């Protein structure tokens, strides 16, 4: 019944998000610590919010993370049927939380196919056109979402307005006009 630190879980209970006065759904949930309670109660700490309004029925595939500048530190106690959350003050983390223990995954993994395609399609909305991608190399040990996956993609070389992205890519010696880019895809 007690959730161990380092385990990722969802808190998509509509009653929780409707109680939130932050106006955004909470998305990525990382167990920073846990406490003993009754037989079916545990305590968790949340780290990130999405841009989806609280109380909306928007699917997670259409939500994006808010920037790291404003994030909240939440705690909840949950039983089998109810979720209660208390909002604390805004915190500004020094770095993003770890998403779990990495392990090698099959390039044709069904668990990664849909969330990765959603992430790639969101990236495709950028001025840069992604033409091919290599299979992901690593993913967290947990097979349920949220996931983090490292992938290498080929992309056409970018224009000046995407120079920051271009700095993370290396020109492809064998294919003129293309670049190899290492990317980490986080999906909640």
UniProtKB/Swiss-Prot annotation:
Annotated transmembrane regions: none
Keyword 4Fe-4S attached: no
A biological process term (GO) from this entry: vasodilation
Domain of life: Eukaryota
Coiled coil location: none
Organism of this sequence: Anarhichas minor
Protein name: Kininogen
Annotated function: Inhibits papain and ficin (cysteine proteinases) but not trypsin (a serine proteinase).
Glycosylation sites: 36, 150, 182
Keyword set, alphabetical order: Cleavage on pair of basic residues, Glycoprotein, Protease inhibitor, Thiol protease inhibitor, Vasoactive, Vasodilator
Gene Ontology MF, one: cysteine-type endopeptidase inhibitor activity
PTMs per UniProt: Bradykinin is released from kininogen by kallikrein. N-glycosylated. Contains O-acetylated sialic acids as terminal elements on biantennary and triantennary N-glycans.
């Amino acid at each position: 019944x007690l959730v161990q630190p380092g385990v990722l879980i969802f808190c998509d209970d509509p009653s929780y998000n409707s109680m939130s006065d932050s106006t955004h759904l909470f998305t990525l949930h990382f167990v920073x610590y846990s406490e003993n309670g009754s037989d079916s109660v545990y305590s968790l700490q949340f780290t990130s919010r999405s841009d989806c309004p609280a109380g909306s029925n928007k699917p997670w595939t259409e939500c994006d993370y808010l920037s790291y500048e404003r994030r909240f530190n939440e705690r909840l106690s949950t039983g089998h049927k109810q979720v209660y959350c208390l909002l604390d003050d805004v915190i500004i983390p020094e770095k993003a939380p770890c998403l779990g223990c990495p392990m090698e995954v099959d390039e044709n993994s069904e668990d990664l196919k849909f969330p990765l395609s959603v992430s790639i399609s969101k990236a495709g909305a950028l001025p840069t056109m992604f033409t091919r991608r290599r299979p992901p190399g690593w993913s967290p040990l947990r097979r349920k979402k949220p996931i983090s996956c490292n992938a290498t993609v080929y992309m056409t070389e970018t224009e000046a307005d995407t120079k920051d992205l271009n700095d993370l890519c290396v020109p492809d010696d064998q294919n003129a006009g293309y670049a190899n880019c290492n990317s980490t895809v986080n999906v909640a």
